Amino acid sequence: MRTEIISIGNELLQGQILDSNAQHISTALSQIGLKVMQITVLPDEIEAIVEALAATKQRSCKIVITTGGLGPTSDDVTKEALAKYLDCPAVVFSKERLSNLGGVDTPVIQYLERATNSSVNISDLQLGGIKNVLGTAPGIYCKQNNQILIVLPGVPTEMQAMLRDTVLPYLQSNFTLPIFYQKTICTIGISEEEIAAILAPWESRLPAPIKLAYLPDLATVKITLAATVPTWEESKRLVEEEFLRVLPLIEPYVYGYNTDTIEEVISRLLKSQKNSLSVAESCTGGYVSQLITQVPGSSVYYQGGIVAYNNTAKHKILGVARNTLLQYGAVSQETAMEMARNVRLKLKANIGLATTGIAGPGGGTIEHPVGTIWIAYADENTCYAQKLQLTNNRLYNIQLTAYHLLDLLRKKLQGK
């Protein structure tokens, strides 16, 4: 069943924002067995939208989901474009009239006649409004000539709620979707190329129904195994068998499964071990603390963080010895370890973490080029530091350092 996504908005094409909606929709659809075959990004222009919708019909696309252009401003033209594409009056898609519709699959003839005060001849069109509980712009459901159009707002929180609460349940209850089972392995500390090389012999022997996908991100790579076969039981059996074969090959790099994030895994470990945590940050400027506190309930184990950016702060606030800073410098194993030990004691935590280094793009020397970073871990019995040599990109260095540090913490908590 061919499915496509159309993302509408000048801001997407101008690079002002990322198209996170398409990513979210694609992920959600894949989890119910629908494969997105094409994603199109369009400007807020009626003709461009009409042409794109017409092209989906030429490609025999069964389901089209659009996002964006439902708001009240002059550049929100999706409803006008939809009316032109369906050859029906634009007043049909007014906010007031959509809000009065019961739901999807509403018989449309009488509705259209009431909306326009005239006789219409659109006997093959079904229309429904999709309730938007988080915003003011209702979504739109249209079915015509065996094609389903689902029109959603571009605001991510609104779109996600409507997709979850209305669209996905509708698709699952009204279509015979492919039966499939999938499992994702989440890795960190290894590149996509390195994983692919390790898995190549195993991958070459995969049964035909098994599909393998790699999803690299900043510091992680996710590997998804999926099988589409006549029964769910058979799909699960195939995936689980290959999962057990592949896991030992990359086990040192595995931090979780399916939708796990490294922060969530650490949260579970800290809670189960009744450990507490504190962080001293220099080059990461609080980013480690941000990641940790993104997890609900992190106050149970997270005591707090200290951003000590210059040497004065490192000495006066964290208590790093002047001699350490003078003899070894701020970017050193010795300073990183003192930061980790001292923040643990100052904030009365079981575990202390630290980052110090040169994020860039300036500040590097021959001895310590840009991207030279030290991360450290300290508990009651041990203290350990690790050197990283990263890139010239400041933001990348900050983010990657944080993930390296969280992975170091994970390994320590797991006794690795």
UniProtKB/Swiss-Prot annotation:
It comes from Amoebophilus asiaticus (strain 5a2). It comes from the Bacteria. PANTHER family: NICOTINAMIDE-NUCLEOTIDE AMIDOHYDROLASE PNCC, NMN AMIDOHYDROLASE-LIKE PROTEIN YFAY. Gene3D superfamilies: CinA-like (3.90.950.20), MoaB/Mog-like domain (3.40.980.10). Belongs to the CinA family. This is CinA-like protein. The lineage of its organism: Bacteria, Pseudomonadati, Bacteroidota, Cytophagia, Cytophagales. NCBIfam families: cinA_nterm, molyb_syn, PncC_domain.
